[in-house]
Protein backbone atom coordinates (compact mmCIF):
# COMPACT_ATOMS: atom_id res chain seq x y z
CA UNK A 1 0.00 0.00 0.00
CA UNK A 2 2.74 2.46 0.94
CA UNK A 3 4.59 1.67 -2.29
CA UNK A 4 1.54 2.68 -4.34
CA UNK A 5 1.10 5.90 -2.35
CA UNK A 6 4.80 6.71 -2.80
CA UNK A 7 4.60 5.99 -6.56
CA UNK A 8 1.49 8.17 -6.90
CA UNK A 9 3.30 11.03 -5.16
CA UNK A 10 6.32 10.57 -7.45
CA UNK A 11 4.02 10.58 -10.49
CA UNK A 12 2.25 13.68 -9.16
CA UNK A 13 5.58 15.53 -8.80
CA UNK A 14 6.65 14.46 -12.30
CA UNK A 15 3.34 15.60 -13.85
CA UNK A 16 3.60 18.93 -12.03
CA UNK A 17 7.16 19.48 -13.29
CA UNK A 18 5.99 18.65 -16.85
CA UNK A 19 3.25 21.27 -16.57
CA UNK A 20 0.41 18.73 -16.84
CA UNK A 21 -0.76 19.01 -13.23
CA UNK A 22 -2.24 22.45 -12.50
CA UNK A 23 -1.35 24.12 -9.19
CA UNK A 24 -3.46 22.85 -6.30
CA UNK A 25 -4.52 19.66 -8.08
CA UNK A 26 -3.88 16.09 -6.86
CA UNK A 27 -3.20 13.23 -9.27
CA UNK A 28 -5.54 10.24 -9.10
CA UNK A 29 -5.82 6.97 -10.97
CA UNK A 30 -9.44 6.55 -9.90
CA UNK A 31 -12.37 8.22 -11.65
CA UNK A 32 -14.31 9.90 -8.83
CA UNK A 33 -18.08 10.21 -9.13
CA UNK A 34 -19.43 13.61 -8.21
CA UNK A 35 -22.98 14.77 -8.76
CA UNK A 36 -25.96 16.00 -6.83
CA UNK A 37 -29.22 14.09 -6.91
CA UNK A 38 -30.30 10.87 -8.52
CA UNK A 39 -28.91 9.28 -11.66
CA UNK A 40 -31.53 9.59 -14.42
CA UNK A 41 -32.77 6.53 -16.24
CA UNK A 42 -32.29 6.03 -19.96
CA UNK A 43 -34.86 4.80 -22.47
CA UNK A 44 -33.50 4.66 -26.03
CA UNK A 45 -37.05 4.62 -27.43
CA UNK A 46 -37.79 8.16 -26.19
CA UNK A 47 -34.34 9.72 -25.77
CA UNK A 48 -33.40 12.55 -28.11
CA UNK A 49 -30.62 15.07 -28.55
CA UNK A 50 -31.51 18.59 -29.67
CA UNK A 51 -29.57 21.55 -31.02
CA UNK A 52 -31.35 24.92 -31.15
CA UNK A 53 -30.99 28.65 -30.59
CA UNK A 54 -28.67 30.76 -32.73
CA UNK A 55 -28.49 28.13 -35.50
CA UNK A 56 -29.89 28.21 -39.05
CA UNK A 57 -32.20 25.25 -38.32
CA UNK A 58 -32.84 23.23 -35.17
CA UNK A 59 -31.70 19.61 -35.07
CA UNK A 60 -33.23 16.64 -33.27
CA UNK A 61 -31.65 13.18 -33.29
CA UNK A 62 -32.85 9.99 -31.63
CA UNK A 63 -30.35 7.61 -30.02
CA UNK A 64 -29.93 5.46 -33.15
CA UNK A 65 -29.38 8.54 -35.35
CA UNK A 66 -26.90 10.02 -32.89
CA UNK A 67 -24.89 6.80 -32.91
CA UNK A 68 -24.66 6.88 -36.72
CA UNK A 69 -22.66 10.13 -36.61
CA UNK A 70 -18.91 9.95 -37.32
CA UNK A 71 -16.95 9.11 -34.18
CA UNK A 72 -13.92 10.80 -32.69
CA UNK A 73 -11.48 9.21 -30.24
CA UNK A 74 -9.39 11.39 -27.94
CA UNK A 75 -6.85 10.95 -25.18
CA UNK A 76 -7.20 13.78 -22.66
CA UNK A 77 -6.11 14.83 -19.20
CA UNK A 78 -9.04 15.87 -17.05
CA UNK A 79 -8.90 18.37 -14.19
CA UNK A 80 -11.82 18.64 -11.78
CA UNK A 81 -12.51 21.80 -9.79
CA UNK A 82 -12.72 19.55 -6.72
CA UNK A 83 -8.92 19.37 -7.05
CA UNK A 84 -8.29 16.00 -8.68
CA UNK A 85 -6.67 15.33 -12.04
CA UNK A 86 -6.61 12.13 -14.08
CA UNK A 87 -4.23 11.69 -16.99
CA UNK A 88 -4.37 9.94 -20.35
CA UNK A 89 -8.10 9.19 -20.26
CA UNK A 90 -9.59 7.62 -23.40
CA UNK A 91 -12.86 9.04 -24.75
CA UNK A 92 -15.04 8.34 -27.76
CA UNK A 93 -18.00 10.26 -29.07
CA UNK A 94 -19.02 12.97 -31.51
CA UNK A 95 -17.13 16.24 -31.86
CA UNK A 96 -19.40 19.28 -32.17
CA UNK A 97 -17.29 20.50 -35.04
CA UNK A 98 -18.22 17.26 -36.85
CA UNK A 99 -21.86 18.38 -36.68
CA UNK A 100 -20.79 21.59 -38.44
CA UNK A 101 -18.60 19.80 -40.97
CA UNK A 102 -21.49 17.43 -41.81
CA UNK A 103 -23.77 20.43 -42.35
CA UNK A 104 -26.11 19.30 -39.57
CA UNK A 105 -25.56 22.42 -37.47
CA UNK A 106 -24.91 25.91 -38.85
CA UNK A 107 -24.41 28.51 -36.11
CA UNK A 108 -25.58 32.01 -36.95
CA UNK A 109 -22.87 34.70 -37.03
CA UNK A 110 -24.07 36.15 -33.70
CA UNK A 111 -23.64 32.81 -31.86
CA UNK A 112 -20.91 33.24 -29.22
CA UNK A 113 -21.71 30.69 -26.50
CA UNK A 114 -23.10 27.17 -26.24
CA UNK A 115 -25.30 26.13 -23.32
CA UNK A 116 -25.30 22.42 -22.55
CA UNK A 117 -28.71 21.24 -21.33
CA UNK A 118 -28.78 18.06 -19.27
CA UNK A 119 -31.26 15.97 -17.29
CA UNK A 120 -32.74 17.47 -14.10
CA UNK A 121 -32.52 20.97 -15.64
CA UNK A 122 -28.74 21.26 -15.23
CA UNK A 123 -27.05 23.69 -17.62
CA UNK A 124 -23.48 24.82 -18.16
CA UNK A 125 -22.09 27.13 -20.81
CA UNK A 126 -18.87 27.48 -22.76
CA UNK A 127 -17.65 29.90 -25.40
CA UNK A 128 -18.39 28.65 -28.92
CA UNK A 129 -14.68 28.65 -29.79
CA UNK A 130 -14.03 26.15 -26.96
CA UNK A 131 -16.88 23.84 -28.01
CA UNK A 132 -15.47 23.75 -31.54
CA UNK A 133 -11.96 22.74 -30.40
CA UNK A 134 -10.75 19.18 -30.58
CA UNK A 135 -10.74 18.92 -26.77
CA UNK A 136 -14.55 19.11 -26.50
CA UNK A 137 -16.50 15.92 -27.16
CA UNK A 138 -20.07 14.67 -26.89
CA UNK A 139 -18.87 11.47 -25.26
CA UNK A 140 -20.56 8.09 -25.22
CA UNK A 141 -17.56 5.94 -24.23
CA UNK A 142 -14.77 6.05 -21.66
CA UNK A 143 -11.77 3.68 -21.84
CA UNK A 144 -13.41 1.67 -24.62
CA UNK A 145 -16.67 1.02 -22.78
CA UNK A 146 -20.01 2.84 -22.78
CA UNK A 147 -20.18 5.45 -20.04
CA UNK A 148 -21.55 4.17 -16.77
CA UNK A 149 -24.76 5.78 -15.49
CA UNK A 150 -22.83 7.52 -12.67
CA UNK A 151 -20.52 9.09 -15.25
CA UNK A 152 -23.27 10.39 -17.51
CA UNK A 153 -24.55 7.51 -19.64
CA UNK A 154 -25.66 7.77 -22.35
CA UNK A 155 -24.06 11.10 -23.25
CA UNK A 156 -21.92 13.72 -21.57
CA UNK A 157 -19.97 16.74 -22.64
CA UNK A 158 -16.25 16.30 -22.04
CA UNK A 159 -13.68 19.06 -22.11
CA UNK A 160 -10.10 18.35 -21.12
CA UNK A 161 -6.46 18.98 -21.86
CA UNK A 162 -4.76 17.18 -24.70
CA UNK A 163 -1.16 16.43 -23.68
CA UNK A 164 1.41 18.41 -25.69
CA UNK A 165 -1.28 20.80 -27.01
CA UNK A 166 -0.87 23.76 -24.68
CA UNK A 167 -2.47 26.10 -27.21
CA UNK A 168 -5.94 24.66 -26.53
CA UNK A 169 -8.07 26.31 -23.88
CA UNK A 170 -8.34 23.97 -20.90
CA UNK A 171 -11.53 24.59 -18.94
CA UNK A 172 -11.99 22.36 -15.96
CA UNK A 173 -13.87 19.07 -16.34
CA UNK A 174 -17.08 20.36 -14.73
CA UNK A 175 -17.75 22.41 -17.85
CA UNK A 176 -18.98 19.20 -19.48
CA UNK A 177 -22.53 18.19 -18.48
CA UNK A 178 -23.46 14.61 -17.60
CA UNK A 179 -26.69 13.14 -19.03
CA UNK A 180 -26.59 15.65 -21.87
CA UNK A 181 -29.79 16.22 -23.86
CA UNK A 182 -29.04 19.24 -26.01
CA UNK A 183 -26.97 22.23 -27.03
CA UNK A 184 -28.32 25.75 -27.26
CA UNK A 185 -26.22 28.10 -29.36
What are these language model-derived features?
Residues 2-185:
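Structured, non-membrane catalytic/scaffold regions adjacent to prosthetic-group chemistry
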Amino acid sequence: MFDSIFKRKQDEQRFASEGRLPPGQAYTQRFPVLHYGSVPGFNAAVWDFRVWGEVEAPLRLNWAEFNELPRTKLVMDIHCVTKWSKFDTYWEGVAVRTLLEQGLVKPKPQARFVMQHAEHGFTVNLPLEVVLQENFLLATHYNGEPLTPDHGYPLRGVVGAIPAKAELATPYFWKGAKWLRGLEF
